[in-house]
């Protein structure tokens, strides 16, 4: 099992998307479906750092969900179990490594219910046909110009793998990472490229451009698609 230290900070994959088809899909959506981080991620925000979530709301960050929590867990969404342990270390481990103590609401693997507008779409078909691993929590990000996604850590690559496909508004956008506490900066191009991003490291997005940034994000439940990018052998 590969962990964050075994993988690069960012890797451009050998899979490309048709940006025009994604833009057409986004244009076809009910624009009322965009929601703030709380509306689009009901329940799962309980398992993230509260200050970070408030920061997303402050920066007018929005998402359009394509995959949602499985219907059998919708009732638990109202009052998910937050018992993650007694010590700070235990709570951190259960949050960032997504152990089996986590409620299904907080488990991204359970966010694989395809919404009606997503079923049969170009994005769904392209992911299914080109990636070996199953996907979950597919969504569209919208970060307004001049705003930021504050530094944060999501989870280790041993739990799941994050993929991002920039769609538009990437000029003067910095994707910052801090592996080994050293800042690294990247600019991801909106040219159809798909990138693995190592969200086990602290990372942020700083938007200094003049156009809102829109990106496709999804999670892979396993590591088959990034194993060839490992910088060190499994331990």
Q: Can you annotate each of these PLM segments?
A:
Residues 8-12, 148, 160-162, 215:
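Intrinsic-disorder/low-complexity, polar/charged segments enriched in Ser/Thr/Lys/Arg/Asp/Glu/Gln
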Residues 13, 22, 138-140, 197, ...:
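Generic structural hydrophobic/aromatic packing signal, biased to beta-strands
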